[in-house]
């Protein structure tokens, strides 16, 4: 998400673009051997190593949402997977048949590029389910990332109550030629990040002036046709949100110094996933940034337009 984080859950528009690396899913159906019908799910890292390997008896029973704060990572992942699998329509899993489902990431799982959202989009497509409903029942959140994974193009995303809406949107690659994404290696949990500021978001929702201000800034970013205008809008969005939610900007967290013409903005949940920076900022904080992995925005973000 380029702009709109957190506030998208209370009705403010958000702007998001897909990245090139994704996640694929293969499904094999075969006659069950002795011992009953089974479903085996194996999820693989970018390097091919398995990070999740679970086996379930069929048919599945519904499972309540996992409490991520009170479960081990493995227990949580198993419960989340079981819950998603249980959402299929009655009779979807054929009697006398077993299944093997294998997923493969094309990016590092710790990068925050969408391992969960691409999994939901892939499985919903396979099972004939509404991906937004699957997302809400399993993970919660706004669902913008699932919409991006489904559409495969940039979009403007907003919610009317619980209903997700989106339109196509693109951003000129000329405007982003000097942008870089900094991977911080501290993947954030979006559900927990939203939970931490839930009460403040509710207060923002009831502040008409603030909501109008956020919508206007997001609209300015959406329509920007000059680099300085676009970057100023992103910096303004971050400053308003930091003040409203009591969160630290990357300048505060990393003790970075603002520089004229520089851009440094959180991408994803604040505090660890990624930073968006431009060349001006990269030059001014070269020493501090050298320990992080960086890629050019235009090398990883897809479906942009060129003037």
PLM ranges: what are they?
Residues 16, 24, 146, 156, ...:
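Conserved hydrophobic/aromatic beta-strand scaffold that supports enzyme active sites
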Residues 51-60, 77, 105, 118-124, ...:
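Long, contiguous secondary-structure blocks with strong helical propensity
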């Amino acid at each position: 998400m380029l702009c709109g984080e957190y506030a998208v859950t209370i009705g403010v528009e958000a702007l998001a673009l897909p990245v090139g690396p994704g996640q694929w899913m293969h499904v094999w159906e075969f006659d069950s051997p002795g011992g009953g019908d089974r479903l085996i799910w194996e999820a693989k890292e970018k390097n091919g190593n398995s990070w999740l390997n679970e086996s379930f008896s069929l048919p599945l029973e519904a499972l309540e949402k996992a409490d991520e704060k009170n479960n081990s990572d493995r227990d949580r992942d198993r419960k989340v997977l079981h819950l998603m699998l249980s959402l299929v329509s009655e009779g979807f899993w054929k009697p006398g048949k077993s299944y093997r489902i294998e997923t493969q990431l094309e990016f590092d799982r710790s990068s925050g590029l969408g391992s969960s959202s691409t999994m939901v989009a892939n499985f919903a497509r396979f099972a004939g389910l509404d991906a937004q409903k699957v997302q809400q029942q399993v993970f919660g959140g706004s669902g913008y990332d699932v919409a991006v994974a489904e559409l495969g193009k940039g979009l403007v995303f907003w919610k009317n109550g619980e209903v997700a809406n989106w339109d196509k949107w693109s951003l000129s690659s000329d405007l982003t030629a000097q942008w870089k994404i900094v991977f911080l290696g501290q993947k954030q949990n979006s559900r927990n990040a939203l939970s931490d500021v839930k009460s403040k978001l509710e207060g923002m929702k009831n502040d008409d002036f603030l909501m109008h201000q956020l919508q206007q800034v997001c609209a300015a970013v959406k329509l920007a046709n000059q680099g300085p205008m676009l970057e100023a809008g992103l910096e303004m969005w971050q400053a308003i949100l930091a003040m409203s939610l009591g969160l630290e900007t990357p300048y505060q967290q990393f003790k970075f110094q603002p520089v004229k013409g520089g851009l440094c903005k959180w991408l994803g949940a604040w505090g660890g996933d990624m930073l968006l920076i431009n060349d001006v900022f990269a030059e001014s904080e070269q020493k501090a940034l050298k320990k992080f992995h960086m890629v050019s925005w235009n090398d990883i973000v897809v479906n942009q337009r060129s003037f």
